[in-house]
């Protein structure tokens, strides 16, 4: 039987055939290239998201297993990543989530719809009407970056340097394979981002403003306010989680519609389907490809003995295509209901930024569908689309397309 090898370029393009094979023949699969277990069935992945024997603090055991030289390189990265909500367990997670929920609330997100639409309109106005363009570079990477930077009160002019630093950090967080200097690049990215954010925090100490950084600085519970490292870590999480994952969602959504023109037509003719369509994009080829956990106590899962200390990857992409949970799982159906995809997680680690990601996708895709008569890839799918080299994230890094016979409305 084939195993899952994240260095296999063909799996970057389309991992779903192999994942389906594993799901049907060995749903709890030992993966030698990753030295980890893979879970591929919907019920197993859903259970893994909340199972008490599976810890979300998977970075610390990995870090401690490294050689001294690599630990020294990554110490500056771990200083902040150890404070991320996604790697925390109660009671620390409970405290941080309680403080963050009112800062990034659904009401705040909905109030941002006009500004999100203005950013989308501005980006699409700059897209070439007679030449191919890279949707990821020209739209999908910029929209969530500008939205998040506006929320945090950061200057959009700083985008290029923030993106460069974030790309370095992504090599570590996204579990990129085959990048020899990824730890040093992650360290450099984290160091630069932390220094930049420390300066932003100091500016707001001198002159508070009405932005998310200021509101996080003012948030307080019975244990007091967030410490400076916690503030920097929270800003990093918002920047990274709110930017990288939404970029991937936008790119994958456009790729899915380009591959399914009948669904594009249906969405154009029935715009009220947009919320349902975004949920289907999240299910069909969502940005969360897997979540990693560490086993805290030995267990047996579907006949397989899993030892304490083992790593487990719950393959969200495989679960979202499980025929036990979804009819016609390999078909894109923007009318699908119900749609209980697992892309945003479950339980205490349900994605804090889910409402914002949904809003950005709805506004952007609606503007593209209603504003242009026809889309087309610039060449074959293999020629036009490059995919992330990552284990836990999925999405295009390049998507060359054309807007043909376009007319602005």
Question: What role is predicted for each listed range?
Answer:
Residues 1-409:
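Cytochrome P450
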């Amino acid at each position: 039987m084939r195993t899952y090898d994240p260095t296999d370029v063909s799996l970057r393009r389309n991992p779903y055939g192999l994942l389906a094979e594993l799901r049907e023949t060995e749903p709890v699969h030992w993966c030698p290239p990753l030295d980890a277990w893979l879970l591929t069935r919907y019920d197993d992945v859903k259970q893994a998201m909340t199972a008490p024997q599976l810890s979300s603090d998977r970075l610390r055991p990995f870090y401690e297993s490294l050689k001294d030289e690599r630990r020294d390189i990554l110490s500056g990265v771990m200083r902040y990543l150890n404070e991320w909500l996604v790697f925390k367990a109660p009671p620390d997670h409970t405290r941080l989530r309680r403080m963050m929920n009112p800062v990034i609330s659904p009401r705040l997100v909905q109030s941002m719809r006009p500004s999100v639409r203005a950013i989308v309109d501005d980006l699409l106005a700059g897209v070439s009407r007679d030449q191919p363009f890279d949707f990821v570079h020209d739209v999908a990477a910029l929209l969530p970056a500008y939205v998040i930077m506006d929320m945090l009160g950061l200057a959009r002019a700083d985008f290029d340097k923030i993106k460069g630093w974030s790309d370095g950090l992504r090599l570590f967080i996204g579990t990129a394979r085959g990048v020899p200097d990824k730890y040093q690049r992650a360290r450099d990215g984290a160091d630069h981002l932390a220094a930049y954010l420390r300066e932003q925090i100091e500016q707001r100490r001198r002159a508070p403003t009405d932005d998310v950084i200021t509101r996080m600085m003012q948030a307080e519970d019975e244990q007091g306010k967030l410490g400076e490292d916690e503030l920097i870590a929270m800003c990093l999480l918002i920047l990274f989680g709110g930017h990288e994952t939404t970029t991937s969602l936008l790119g994958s959504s456009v790729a899915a519609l380009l591959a399914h023109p009948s669904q594009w037509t249906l969405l154009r003719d029935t715009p009220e389907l947009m919320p349902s369509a975004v949920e289907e994009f999240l299910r069909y080829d969502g940005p969360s490809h897997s979540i990693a956990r560490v086993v805290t106590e030995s267990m047996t899962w579907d006949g397989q003995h899993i030892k304490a200390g083992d790593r487990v990857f719950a393959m969200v992409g495989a679960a979202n295509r499980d025929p036990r949970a979804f009819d016609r799982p390999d078909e894109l159906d923007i009318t699908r209901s119900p749609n209980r995809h697992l892309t945003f997680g479950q339980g205490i680690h349900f994605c804090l930024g889910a409402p914002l990601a949904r809003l950005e996708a709805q506004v952007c895709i609606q503007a593209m569908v209603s504003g242009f008569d026809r889309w087309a890839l610039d060449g074959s799918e293999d020629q036009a689309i490059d995919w992330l080299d990552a284990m836990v994230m999925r999405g295009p890094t390049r998507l060359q397309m054309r807007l043909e016979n376009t007319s602005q409305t």
